[in-house]
Design a protein with these regions (language model features):
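Sequence/fold signature of self-assembling virion shell proteins
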Residues: 44-47, 88-187
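Long, contiguous amphipathic alpha-helices that act as assembly "spine/axial" helices in icosahedral shell
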Residues: 1-24, 66-79, 116, 148, ...
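Hydrophobic, aromatic-enriched interface-forming segments
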Residues: 49-88
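Generic, low-specificity signal for short hydrophobic/alpha-helical stretches with a mild N-terminal bias
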Residues: 41, 57, 64-67, 98, ...
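Alpha-helical scaffold segments that mediate packing/assembly in large oligomeric complexes
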Residues: 1-62, 181-187
């Protein structure tokens, strides 16, 4: 799972016309910072900023302007960004969201109709900064020829079991403008 996440996130670097596998100034050069969703991230002298309500709305607007469908959008973020969101009243308090589930359960659920997913597999573009993505399901694709296959075998010489898992898969970018990468500080 970590390897698949890493491959998909590496493609996220290329969203909005970015360079996949760039270094220095070319690393994540089309990513935006989390605070406003429009200022370009600079990897050389990091300007990453905490995710905000305005930043999320601006990234959604970027997808809207590219005629990306409203359904099947996902916000994928590192745990530090999820922690920042839980500190924003608009996303947690009952008067804003109705049920107040985010306070009770710690689960964010949806923001502006976008499903929120938290992963510790988010890459680090520079220093401790962490990357995330707001994207539509058509932005990136994962194709599996063979799903995860697990096997176990008893190894007498080690008096234990050998457990292996493998998969055959590939990833690709389908729609360049159907996603936006963003960067937040790692701490």
């Amino acid at each position: 799972a970590t390897q698949v996440d890493t491959k998909l996130f590496s493609l996220g670097e290329g969203l909005q016309g970015g360079t996949v596998g760039g270094s220095g100034a070319a690393a994540w050069e089309t990513a935006v910072i989390g605070s406003d969703g429009s200022t370009a991230y600079t990897g050389n002298s990091t300007n990453a900023a905490d995710i905000t309500d305005a930043g999320i709305r601006r990234m959604i607007l970027t997808l809207d302007n590219a005629d990306v469908p409203m359904d099947n959008r996902s916000l994928i973020m590192p745990p530090i960004a999820a922690n920042d969101l839980l500190g924003i009243n608009r996303f947690t308090e009952q008067q804003f969201i109705g049920s107040g589930d985010a306070i009770r359960t710690g689960k964010i659920g949806q923001i502006y109709g976008v499903d929120v997913f938290v992963t510790s597999n988010a890459p680090t573009p520079a220093g401790t900064d962490r990357a995330g993505m707001l994207l539509h399901k058509d932005a990136l694709v994962l194709a599996e020829q063979v799903g995860v296959r697990s096997q176990t075998q008893y190894k007498q010489e080690y008096l234990g079991d050998l457990f292996t898992s493998d998969s055959i898969y590939g990833v690709a970018e389908l729609r360049n403008d159907a996603g936006v990468a963003f960067v937040v500080p790692g701490s």
